Amino acid sequence: MNCSTVSVRLAVAVIALATASFAAAPIAVAQKRPADLETLPPVPTNYTPPKTPWGDYDFSHTYTLDNLADARILFQRPKEYGTRVWVTDEEFARRMKAAEGSDSHFGVRGASTTGTKGLADWMRHSDFAKRTSLLVSPANGRLPPLTPQGQRLYETGRSSWVPGQAFDWVDDFDTWDRCITRGFPASMFPNRYNNGIRIFQSPGYIVIALEMLGTRVIPIGDAAHWPKPLESWMGNSRAHWEGKTLVIETTNIKSGDSATHDPFKRAASPVIVTMVGGAPLDTTPTSPEARTVERLTMTGPNTIMDELTYSDPETYTAPWTAREEWTRDDSYKFYEYACHEGDVQVRNYIVASRAERAKVARGEKPATDNLARFTTDFDHDPGVGAPPPAARPTASNGKEGAGG
């Protein structure tokens, strides 16, 4: 859902989640920055977690991705960094200055929060704060090109993030617009709010509960994946242990695209615009061949390193891999993510879009469309310097709905 919608729908749910949670967040164990800033060291495995009574390593805590989001360590690497995995001291100093400024403006005002609390402290203690992006492969830290078929479906897809998009029915919106799902693996990456992750374990199972839309119940062992025709929004996951690392393989992710008008053939985008540094438009298709391999490793008593590789040969020309650090914070509170309840946005978009087109047909001046800024990178990493000037809204072509 676009920014104006989020502010209406989720104001209460956002209270003290993305920022105040830093107050009690434990300090991470650092993965040291090497001298060669293009080198990506392997995930450290020297820490040995305690075990559950049945012998599995115990990951069962509450974690948050807020640090990554608020520090603006983007999913896709800013082009200024090139193939560097790590920032320089000068670039890190700019990030630190921004974090200290954000912490200094922390406050709670009514149904919202401002600033952050404890962000600069996390950055001082975790070398992940010196990373240039979550994406580590391809080497440039950017998503690989789409295949011709993937590009065609991407360009013809529909969502509330598409400039000039007309809205006539619910199939003109993506799955997150409609509070169904953020998609997979998009649900596993930092968003602008509600970044909590809670792990539960029992013999033979691990449960990954996401604060925003989704709980994954994952068998551990050699159980077979579902047969091919069966699919779900979060896919079908199976896990096994490789030493101290939990490896989760996910297949059977709901396939489809956002260009079709058949609601049963719609699918979520694997990477979405509101991921911090994600991909524009929320219209990337998902084929039946899509799969992920996640490797979860506790690198210290208060951190998990999650390495996720996504492959979909019908959509992307190459697989891509991201790493992210989960910070343990057992005091982090999950609040109900009430998205459908009281939701009037989809109806309002449709009504406003029809009214706008009728107005233009009468020869009246069209409204401005401010969605063009979401078609390219719009998140800003303070490490690269001052942000570029904001683009000014342009007149719509008469197709614009309420998103403008």
Tell what function each PLM region has.
Residues 2-3, 12, 22-404:
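PEST-like low-complexity, intrinsically disordered acidic/proline/serine-rich tracts
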Residues 9-15:
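Sec-dependent N-terminal signal peptides
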